[in-house]
Amino acid sequence: DLLPVIISERIINDIDMSIGNYIVIDGQFRSYNRYEDTSNKLLLRVFVRDIIVPDDNELEELKRHPNEVFLNGYLCKETKFRTTPFGREITDMLIAVNRSYNKSDYIPCIAWGRNARYCEKLEVGDHIKLWGRIQSRKYQKKNDNEDYETKTAYEVSVTKLEHIKTENNRKKEDEEGEDDFEE
């Protein structure tokens, strides 16, 4: 996957950023709204907080888990369950993740298989924690001229999910406990 990142110059001053060098990025997956033409576009970027150059021993371990993300947030839009043309069950979700200074990031997520069937039943306001990877995928969008344009979507592909039923923003508080699901 190719992912857009935002890095401060002060972070990369003493780091060899040559093509082919391995680095470890620690940061936050953030969203930004950009007004384009007549609509808002959600931009997603990895905001880099630290970069580490791993030694050879660390590198082998890190290669086993090259892209990991953890989100702790609230479902802010109704889920959309569907089956792909290849028969895969998926659920699309939008998660609001709060951060400092009363800001929130809105992160699109996709759950597969058993997780998708479980997520289909989640409600707006539900508190969830999820683990997965940030993925990029190409898709075709028809424009006003009836031509197709290739675009890139960024989303979190969910591998594990925890539904925190005792801490949610729903209007009714009738459930307790938590559920844990892993693909």
Region annotations inferred by a language model:
Residues 20-34, 126-139:
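Flexible glycine-rich surface loops and low-complexity tracts that mediate binding to linear polymers
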Residues 1-2, 6, 10-16, 37-40, ...:
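Acidic, gly/ser/pro-rich intrinsically disordered tails
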Residues 18-26, 33-50:
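Ordered, amphipathic secondary-structure segments that act as subunit-interaction surfaces
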